[in-house]
UniProtKB/Swiss-Prot annotation:
Homodimer or homotetramer. This is Catalase-peroxidase. Residues 1-21 are annotated as: Disordered. It catalyses: H2O2 + AH2 = A + 2 H2O; 2 H2O2 = O2 + 2 H2O. Formation of the three residue Trp-Tyr-Met cross-link is important for the catalase, but not the peroxidase activity of the enzyme. The active site is at residue 97. Its EC number is 1.11.1.21. One of its GO terms (biological process) is hydrogen peroxide catabolic process. Its cofactor is heme b. One of its GO terms (molecular function) is metal ion binding. Heme b binds at residue 265. It comes from Dechloromonas aromatica (strain RCB). The gene is katG. InterPro entries: Catalase_peroxidase (IPR000763), Haem_peroxidase (IPR002016), Haem_peroxidase_sf (IPR010255), Peroxidases_AS (IPR019794). There is a cross-link at residues 96-224 (Tryptophyl-tyrosyl-methioninium (Trp-Tyr) (with M-250)). The lineage of its organism: Bacteria, Pseudomonadati, Pseudomonadota, Betaproteobacteria, Rhodocyclales.
Length: 736
């Protein structure tokens, strides 16, 4: 008789679990992924339902926490000894790599969620041995508990590392809320191999090194660029081109890029002491007994003098635990000779190094080493743009220190959103243009009676339901939950570049804004006591009034929630280049697509919905409602499945699911479809892929059926208003 026991549930040998089985996406890889709309469910969150991190953070003894972090920097542990007795370089790298996943294209990545704790980021090759940094932090996290999130603690540890080595940081803002499971919405690349070069299958590059959007890193598993050069080619000038594109996609200009590179490499060292083949698997693949630690190294002691991380070995300058101008002294003070580290990585060593510039070994005081530079470092000297900036910083240490302080602050706060979200005693007073500043309210706000009066004026202004709804949606739907940018507050839709975006229908927008500004000026000039209505509020109020009127036309007297308090930003407070990344390439809610893409229109709709923090039901009801309200760009009839446009009816769903209609691709236009009467062949409707996906995809069809039922009209109106109001207030952090 076999000693193998049968599974008590199935009666067969071996437990039957979902591990190893084919998922729906394995069977049907092209099926629309709606899971990204339902991430981070309350059931996955261990915190109490009423837990408020921002309120809890206010009870933190911030000064005591910083003192504990300072002490940590120089308390070396035998299980992972500190280089030169100071963990500063390690914690700077941890914070940098937490923030450095951010990219402007979709605002995803960054330090805002503490996602370095989870796959895939916790196991990226570029994050080697940062698991040890987080374990070193654990006693402090354990001590302060929920008063400080992992996301905030990792960034604050980086600040304290800099400060403990003599650098004055620009400030710190808390407010990053931890997630509890890996994100599913972030596209990190199509490669199936870590560190795959651009000549490998599924490359992120095409043509003449054109990097796939919205990616910023040059290889799968890297934070920025390959330090050895493009695809490992040790060409500093070519590396400079990679660096410029990558850092630009992470919101950094040339000066900020030089400051960050030089400032970060002022501290610590790279590790490549031995054969990388002796380094074990990353944390997600490590044996259970390692308890989440990866990269266990069998070379010597595997740590300290024997540590291998990137494979590059050495420090950039003397005094690696002290802020000074030594990086530039070395960069410009020597010629550099290409060599290989003990781990085989390509790097550069100072030729004929002077004795006073030899760097004591991080763990063996009897040894000294010449400074090293990576190929990416040499780009700071030999790139025609970076070179002059580097020389200016070399000659002006104060300018360098200020530039690095500001760039580091930007790096670590870029995805935290507007300044209103920042917490703690070290928030800088200065407003920075990349924060998309919005003026504070400095006047009495409109009251309930004013709102009613303004609604009446808006509805009597001659503007159509479609014009009012489209303008409000265009203003509010720029919001991105990823980096908390965009939204209706600030009324930047009236400023460059938003006023000229094709999706915003510039001619119609100019007309609508002209009417709204007239109503605004008439109201404000009639007030005593300084009461005002902002254009930002009026834009949203116009949409709300139009929705109410459309619901009334459908037989429902409803009030769409509206809370005043938005203000109007100026053009000087608006960085046009920075705002440009918010322009929609596609917006399925408006049946808009700028051009044809390799990604389907319905996938882009789901991506947009995720950035708007919408659920699948919210996405569904908004599409159906916006279609019948005339929300399509250019007045397109696609998806307008109603004979009463401007009425908030459930006609979109009723007619989409009507089996009396048969759909065929339109002959004249890819991605468009014609719906004809099944019996007579008479043309009835036209539609886009976005429209038809609500009848094609099984999950979305199930939702569409809810709203197409005979008893669904009131629910449809109620749900549409709730979802509409959510979008209108996504950026109202003053209300949260």
């Amino acid at each position: 008789m076999s000693n193998e026991q049968k599974c008590p549930f199935s009666g067969t040998h071996g437990a039957r679990t979902t591990v190893g089985t084919q998922s729906n996406r394995d069977w049907w890889p092209k099926v629309l992924n709606l899971n990204i709309l339902h991430q981070h469910a309350p059931a996955a969150n261990p915190m109490d339902a009423d837990f408020d991190y921002s309120e809890t953070f206010k009870t933190l003894d911030f000064g005591a926490l910083k003192q504990d972090l300072y002490a940590l920097m120089t308390t070396s542990q035998d299980w992972w000894p500190a280089d030169w007795g100071h963990y500063g370089g390690l914690f700077i790298r941890m914070a940098w790599h937490s923030a450095g996943t951010y990219r402007t294209g979709d605002g995803r990545g960054g330090a805002g969620t503490g996602n370095q704790r989870f796959a895939p980021i916790n196991s990226w090759p570029d994050n080697g041995n940062l698991d040890k940094a987080r374990r070193l932090l654990w006693p402090i996290k354990q001590k302060y508990g929920n008063k400080i999130s992992w996301a905030d603690l990792m960034i604050l540890a980086g600040n304290c590392a800099l400060e403990s080595m003599g650098f004055k940081t620009f400030g710190f803002g808390g407010g990053r809320v931890d997630i509890w499971q890996p994100e599913e919405d972030i596209y990190w690349g199509a490669e199936r191999e870590w560190l795959a070069t651009s000549d490998k299958p599924n490359s992120r590059y095409s043509g003449e090194r054109n990097l796939d959007n919205p990616l910023a890193a040059v290889q799968m598993g890297l934070i920025y660029v390959n330090p050895e050069g493009p695809d490992g080619n040790p060409d500093p000038v070519a590396s400079g081109r990679d660096i410029r594109e990558t850092f630009a996609r992470m919101a950094m200009n040339d000066e900020e890029t030089v400051a960050l590179t030089a400032g970060g490499h002022t501290f610590g060292k790279a590790h490549g002491a031995g054969d990388p083949a002796l380094v074990g698997p990353e944390p997600e693949a490590a044996p259970i007994e390692e308890q989440g630690l990866g990269w266990i190294n069998k070379f010597g002691s595997g740590k300290g003098i024997h540590a291998t991380t990137s494979g590059i070995e050495g420090a950039w300058k003397p005094n690696p635990t002290k802020w000074d101008n030594g990086y530039f002294d070395m960069l410009f003070g020597y010629e550099w000779e290409l060599t290989r580290s003990p781990a085989g990585a390509k790097q550069w060593v100072a030729k004929d190094c002077k004795p006073e510039h030899l760097i004591p070994d991080a763990h063996d005081p009897s040894k000294k080493h010449p400074p090293m530079m990576t190929t990416a470092d040499l780009a700071m000297r030999f790139d025609p743009i970076y070179g002059p900036i580097s020389r200016r910083f070399h000659q002006d240490p104060a300018a360098f220190a200020d530039a690095f302080a500001r760039a580091w602050f930007k790096l670590t706060h870029r995805d935290l959103g507007p300044k209103a979200r920042y917490l703690g005693p070290e928030v800088p007073a200065e407003d920075l243009v990349w924060q998309d500043p919005i003026p504070a309210v400095d006047h009495p706000l409109i009251e309930v009676t004013d709102v009613a009066s303004l609604k009446a004026k808006l509805l009597a202004s001659g503007l159509s339901t479609a014009e009012l709804v489209s303008t409000a949606w265009a203003s509010a739907s720029t919001f991105r939950g990823s980096d908390k940018r965009g939204g209706a507050n600030g009324a930047r839709i009236r400023l460059a570049p938003q006023k000229d975006w094709a999706a915003n229908q510039p001619a119609q927008l100019a007309k609508v804004l002209g009417v709204l500004e007239g109503i605004q000026q008439a109201f404000n000039s009639a007030q005593t006591g300084g009461k005002k209505v902002s254009l930002a509020d009026l834009i949203v109020l116009g949409g709300c009034a139009a929705v109410e009127a459309a619901a009334k036309a459908a037989g429902f007297a409803v009030a769409v929630p509206f809370t005043p308090g938005r203000t109007d930003a100026s053009q000087e407070q608006t960085d046009a280049e920075s705002i440009a990344v918010l322009e929609p390439e596609a917006d399925g809610f408006r049946n808009y697509q700028k051009k044809t893409y390799s990604v389907s229109a319905e996938e882009m709709l789901v991506d947009k919905a995720q950035l708007l923090t919408l659920s699948a039901p919210e996405m569904t009801v908004l599409v159906g409602g916006l279609r019948v309200l005339g929300g399509n760009v250019g007045g397109s009839s696609d998806g307008v499945f109603t004979t009463t446009p401007g009425t908030l009816s459930n006609d979109f769903f009723v007619n989409l699911l009507d089996m009396g209609t048969v759909w065929k691709p339109a002959a004249e236009s890819a991605g468009r479809y014609e719906g004809r009467d099944r019996q007579t062949g008479v043309a009835k409707w036209t539609a886009s892929r976005v429209d038809l996906i609500f009848g094609s995809n099984s999950q979305l069809r199930a939702l569409a059926e809810v709203y197409a039922q005979n008893d669904a009209q009131e629910k449809f109106v109620r749900d549409f208003i709730a979802a509409w109001s959510k979008v209108m207030e996504l950026d109202r952090f003053d209300l949260k």
